[in-house]
């Protein structure tokens, strides 16, 4: 009875973000299991200890529990329990960038349960990370179709959609997909049954949507909400999301603080794919700040990002990091020569502003994120002492830049 009660309590702790308690209770169940044969409680304890330690950035401690979960799950002959064990093992290796090991568990899980949205969405992200676009799209379609078939109320699967679709958009640039994620997030947050963890995942999704759209107002709203219950990692680094929100809000110093937190967490945990993305986003933020004091840090981040993404075969990210590095090297060699300290990229944006283009239209033409355009426009207004886009356009005409 004690094992069953602890198992139920540890599950509640996990979904309510009381992770230290979830681990402590799970370990107590494992201790009791040496005296009582109760595979269901053992499997529950092991899996919550495993996934909690994974999210806390302790994969070495999580690994034996994830492996034991799989052994015990096979003994239970419960399809859901086994699929969950396979999924946790897949996550453990994906977060560390061991794609081949992750795929082994993914294939087993999808063979066992082809419509399991957890397995499908994880595989979708994996394939997008390594640039297997055709395969990734197939998993995306399966994921979206699977979510549409779910009955109310919304649960983890809808929250995962709210979070994972924007992560896909960060890789592909397909902004039209964001509406799907936004609808899922709104559905989750309107449900009284949503647990704190599920609600937080939905808010992370809304945060990424605000970042990708360059929506400063929404970015401020999401930052204020997320900073109160700050969680370090679930699929993505919480500090990386907060750093990107800060960048969107125009606070580069605050962004740098969060990015440093994300770097420290990912390095300690060995979560190399997320570390590479953090290097990219941090470097881009410093590039936009345009301080000569940041140049050494920028190159250090870009070199690390290139090294990791090359080693892990993360082709889409590698392309983006190389592009940032070329921009930085070009600006160092050439300098700008433009008035008011405008950079070459800012002049490109200014010309399009003067032509009446919206931020999204500029982003599409220059093949950069909308949030990046928004930051450039803010820098342009400050440097040219312009109150709005119309005054900036007039400045461009006077200076012969348009």
Question: What annotation goes with each model-predicted range?
Answer:
Residues 10, 50, 90, 124, ...:
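Conserved small-residue packing positions in alpha-helical repeats and bundles
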Residues 1-235:
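Extended non-membrane alpha-helical scaffolds
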Residues 257, 300, 326, 332-378, ...:
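Helix-turn-helix DNA-binding segment
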Residues 10, 50, 151, 172, ...:
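Short coil/turn linking the two alpha-helices of tandem helical-hairpin repeats
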Residues 219-281, 329-339, 361:
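Generic long, charged, amphipathic alpha-helical segments
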Residues 314-334:
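Short, flexible helix-to-coil linker/hinge segments that flank and couple to helix-turn-helix
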């Amino acid at each position: 009875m004690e094992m069953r009660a602890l198992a139920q309590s540890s599950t509640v702790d996990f979904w309510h973000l009381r992770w230290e308690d979830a681990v402590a209770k799970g370990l107590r169940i494992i201790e009791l299991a040496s005296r009582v044969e109760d595979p269901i409680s053992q499997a529950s304890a092991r899996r919550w200890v495993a996934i909690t330690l994974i999210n806390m950035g302790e994969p070495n401690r999580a690994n034996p529990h994830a492996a034991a979960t799989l052994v015990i799950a096979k003994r239970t002959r419960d399809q859901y329990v086994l699929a969950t064990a396979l999924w946790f093992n897949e996550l453990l290796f994906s977060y560390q960038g061991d794609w081949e090991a992750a795929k082994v568990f993914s294939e087993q899980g999808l063979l066992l349960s082809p419509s399991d949205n957890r397995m499908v969405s994880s595989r979708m992200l994996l394939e997008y990370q390594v640039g297997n676009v055709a395969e990734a799209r197939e998993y995306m379609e399966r994921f979206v179709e699977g979510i549409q078939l779910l009955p109310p109320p919304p649960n983890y699967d809808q929250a995962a959609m709210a979070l994972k679709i924007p992560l896909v958009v960060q890789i592909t640039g397909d902004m039209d997909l964001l509406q799907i994620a936004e609808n899922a997030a709104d559905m989750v947050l309107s449900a009284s049954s949503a647990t704190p963890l599920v609600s937080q995942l939905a808010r992370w999704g809304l945060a990424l949507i605000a970042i990708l759209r360059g929506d400063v107002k929404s970015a401020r709203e999401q930052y204020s909400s997320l900073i109160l219950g700050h969680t370090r990692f679930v699929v993505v680094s919480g500090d990386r999301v907060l750093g990107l929100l800060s960048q969107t809000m125009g606070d580069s110093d605050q962004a740098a603080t969060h990015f440093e937190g994300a770097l420290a967490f990912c390095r300690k945990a060995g979560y190399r794919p997320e570390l590479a993305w953090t290097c990219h986003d941090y470097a881009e933020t410093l590039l936009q700040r345009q301080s000569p004091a940041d140049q050494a840090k920028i190159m250090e981040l870009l070199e690390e990002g290139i090294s990791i993404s090359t080693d892990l075969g993360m082709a889409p990210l590698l392309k983006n990091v190389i592009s940032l590095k070329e921009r930085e090297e070009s600006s160092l060699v050439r300098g700008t020569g433009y008035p008011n300290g405008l950079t070459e990229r800012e002049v490109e944006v200014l010309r399009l502003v003067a032509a009446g283009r919206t931020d999204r239209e500029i982003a599409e033409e220059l093949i950069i994120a909308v949030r990046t355009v928004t930051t450039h426009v803010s820098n342009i207004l400050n440097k040219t002492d312009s109150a709005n886009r119309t005054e900036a356009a007039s400045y461009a005409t006077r200076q012969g830049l348009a």
